[in-house]
């Protein structure tokens, strides 16, 4: 089955690569319209997925990721329309010039070809990835988690209907709707057809892909994100940032999981933090110093292993550190190179933090929640890469392209 999907996807990618920006935008507009027109069928499938997942004991954080509402589906359709408004990078000349040999050389952006994406209980990913791949002239093979297989199947049918209506091959967007996990291992070996693989899931999935895939893999999306409260931090705005970073949508990978507090501000800051977290319904997981805090927030002892895990819930590690060195060392040991922030009024400390924390996104006096394709002005994102090759941070349109060198001559030969 996968062999035939790969053959069809590769054939479709050749046709997509030749489309103009206008032709690609018309397809995206049609997809957005069809998502709204077929909302009832998609939501009906999603209800079945959510009910099954709840019966299987899926966590509330994962159920939140899985669930669609009319408002969420409308927002997904609007995101597709936003992709239409983004500049098409395909065909863009990156650089070039006339060489001494007389050869005119240019480096031009081109589609990758076929992209494979493996993801879990995130039905929005189906549309986000499909729209970005189509905008950049790529075909895509999707493998969502078993929790979303009804929703994904319904969504892909809508997308394929739009493709067909626009005279394009339905194989431009395909989904592996069989929940058999053995198919993942088979997909990892499809380097003959898939040019890049993006796993969006937990550490286990990423490890499997890195170890077993014969396809170039871009990993990311695991966010053990930190905020360091420096000794010079202004407490009131610092608390506002922390509340946003923890509570706006706890199930996301850019949510803060560990708060590092400079010991010189701890005595003044921690009581205010406890009060604010109690109002926000956040449970604090504190180290020995924090456990001595008497405040209204729910407080439990921090377990060492929690420093390396995503809570994806209203839980927050709080650790008091001796100084900036301690904060940076902690992030290097426990961070996932996703998003980390410093709250400070000392711009020298801010500059040092930015230079020494090796994460895809580093913030000064701002929430980690900004690490997102839409917030960065990239449109919907395929993933947030925490590696350094071929892309880093939110992966927008350019991350779905490569380049080719093109030489123009006039009977030009090498001397």
From Swiss-Prot:
It is found in: Cytoplasm. GO terms for biological process: L-proline biosynthetic process. It comes from Salmonella paratyphi B (strain ATCC BAA-1250 / SPB7). Pathway: Amino-acid biosynthesis; L-proline biosynthesis; L-glutamate 5-semialdehyde from L-glutamate: step 2/2. PANTHER family: DELTA-1-PYRROLINE-5-CARBOXYLATE SYNTHASE, GLUTAMATE SEMIALDEHYDE DEHYDROGENASE. One of its GO terms (molecular function) is glutamate-5-semialdehyde dehydrogenase activity. It catalyses: L-glutamate 5-semialdehyde + phosphate + NADP(+) = L-glutamyl 5-phosphate + NADPH + H(+). GO terms for cellular component: cytoplasm. Its EC number is 1.2.1.41. The gene is proA. Catalyzes the NADPH-dependent reduction of L-glutamate 5-phosphate into L-glutamate 5-semialdehyde and phosphate. The product spontaneously undergoes cyclization to form 1-pyrroline-5-carboxylate. Its main location: cytoplasm. SUPFAM superfamilies: ALDH-like. Coiled coil: none annotated. This is Gamma-glutamyl phosphate reductase. The lineage of its organism: Bacteria, Pseudomonadati, Pseudomonadota, Gammaproteobacteria, Enterobacterales. HAMAP family: ProA. Keywords: Amino-acid biosynthesis, Cytoplasm, NADP, Oxidoreductase, Proline biosynthesis. CDD domains: ALDH_F18-19_ProA-GPR (cd07079). It is an enzyme of class 1 (oxidoreductase). Belongs to the gamma-glutamyl phosphate reductase family.
């Amino acid at each position: 089955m996968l062999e035939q999907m790969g053959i069809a996807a590769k054939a479709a990618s050749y046709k997509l690569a030749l489309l103009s920006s206008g032709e690609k935008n018309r397809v995206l507009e049609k997809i957005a319209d069809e998502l709204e027109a077929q909302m009832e069928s998609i939501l009906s499938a999603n209800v079945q997925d959510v009910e099954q997942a709840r019966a299987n004991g899926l966590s509330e954080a994962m159920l939140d990721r899985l669930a669609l509402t009319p408002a969420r589906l409308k927002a997904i359709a609007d995101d597709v329309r936003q992709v239409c408004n983004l500049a098409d990078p395909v065909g863009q000349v990156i650089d070039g010039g006339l060489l001494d040999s007389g050869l005119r050389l240019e480096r031009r952006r081109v589609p990758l070809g076929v992209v494979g994406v493996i993801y879990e209980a995130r039905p929005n990913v189906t549309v986000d990835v499909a729209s970005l791949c189509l905008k950049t002239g790529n075909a895509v093979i999707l493998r969502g988690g078993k929790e979303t297989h009804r929703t994904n199947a319904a969504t892909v049918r809508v997308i394929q209907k739009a493709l067909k209506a626009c005279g394009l091959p339905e194989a431009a967007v395909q989904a592996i709707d069989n929940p058999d996990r053995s198919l993942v291992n088979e997909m990892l070996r499809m380097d003959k057809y898939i040019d890049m693989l993006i796993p969006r899931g937990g550490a286990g999935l990423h490890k499997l892909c890195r170890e077993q895939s014969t396809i170039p893999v871009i990993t990311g999306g695991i966010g053990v994100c930190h905020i360091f409260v420096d000794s010079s931090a202004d407490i009131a705005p610092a608390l506002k940032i922390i509340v946003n970073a923890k509570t706006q949508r706890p199930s996301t990978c850019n949510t803060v999981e560990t708060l590092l507090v400079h010991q010189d501000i701890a005595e003044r800051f921690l009581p205010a933090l406890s009060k604010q977290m109690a109002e926000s319904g956040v449970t604090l997981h504190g180290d020995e110093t924090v456990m001595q805090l008497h405040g209204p927030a729910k407080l439990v002892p921090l377990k060492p292993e929690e420093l390396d895990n995503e809570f994806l819930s209203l839980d927050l590690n709080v650790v008091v550190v001796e100084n900036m060195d301690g904060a940076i060392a902690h992030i290097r040991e426990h961070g996932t190179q996703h998003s980390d922030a410093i709250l400070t009024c000392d711009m020298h400390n801010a500059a040092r933090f930015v230079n020494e924390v090796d994460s895809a996104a580093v913030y000064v006096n701002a929430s980690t929640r900004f690490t997102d394709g839409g917030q960065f002005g990239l449109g919907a994102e395929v993933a947030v890469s925490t590696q350094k090759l071929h892309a880093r941070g939110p992966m927008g349109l350019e991350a779905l392209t490569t380049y080719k060198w093109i030489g123009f001559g006039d009977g030009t030969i090498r001397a």
